[in-house]
Amino acid sequence: MSHNSQAFLSTNAGLPPSYETIKEEYGVTELGEPSNSAVVRTTVINMPREVSVPDHVVWSLFNTLFFNACCLGFVAYAYSVKSRDRKMVGDVVGAQAYASTAKCLNISSLIFSILMVIICIIIFSTTSVVVFQSFAQRTPHSGF
């Protein structure tokens, strides 16, 4: 195996090359103002915008766990999961359709459940008043 050593000759031995040396070595020219004779071409790229489809999973889960009147919350949750699946596949139209159905079911469940709570409060308050009045009539008053 032969060892050939060649000396590296440079004017700036041991120093990094300056900007001027690099510019001359690679033939870099400075650019001036653009000439008006050049044709300017533009390229337009139409990027599809990201469509955010709300899937209402959290709302459906809330209705399923807390209200769930006539199982509407559970059905809304099923449609919400279908909407999320369609969104992951890339079917935006299908995701919007399932999300719309889930939203309608959630609204129906919420309204029905609120009405049921109001009716229960009314029934509880009227029965407690009636029971209180019946106890008041049975107990004799001790004359103070």
From Swiss-Prot:
The modification N-acetylmethionine is found at residue 1. GO terms for cellular component: late endosome membrane; lysosomal membrane; plasma membrane; protein-containing complex. Residues 132-144 are extracellular. It is a single-pass type II membrane protein. Its main location: membrane. The keyword Cell membrane applies. Predominantly expressed in nascent primordial germ cells, as well as in gonadal germ cells. Palmitoylation on membrane-proximal cysteines controls clustering in membrane compartments and antiviral activity. Phosphorylation at Tyr-19 is required for endosomal and lysosomal location. Pfam families: CD225. InterPro entries: CD225/Dispanin_fam, IFITM_antiviral_protein. One of its GO terms (biological process) is host-mediated suppression of symbiont invasion. It comes from the Eukaryota. The chain crosses the membrane at residues 111-131. A lipid is attached at residues 70-71, 104 (S-palmitoyl cysteine). Keywords: Acetylation, Antiviral defense, Cell membrane, Endosome, Immunity, Innate immunity, Lipoprotein, Lysosome, Membrane, Palmitate, Phosphoprotein, Transmembrane, Transmembrane helix. It is found in: Cell membrane; Lysosome membrane; Late endosome membrane. The modification Phosphotyrosine is found at residue 19. Residues 57-77 dip into the membrane without crossing it. Residues 1-56, 78-110 are cytoplasmic. IFN-induced antiviral protein which inhibits the entry of viruses to the host cell cytoplasm, permitting endocytosis, but preventing subsequent viral fusion and release of viral contents into the cytosol. Active against multiple viruses, including influenza A virus, SARS coronavirus (SARS-CoV), Marburg virus (MARV) and Ebola virus (EBOV), Dengue virus (DNV) and West Nile virus (WNV). Can inhibit: influenza virus hemagglutinin protein-mediated viral entry, MARV and EBOV GP1,2-mediated viral entry and SARS-CoV S protein-mediated viral entry. Interacts with CD81. Belongs to the CD225/Dispanin family. This is Interferon-induced transmembrane protein 2. It comes from Mus musculus. The lineage of its organism: Eukaryota, Metazoa, Chordata, Craniata, Vertebrata. The gene is Ifitm2.
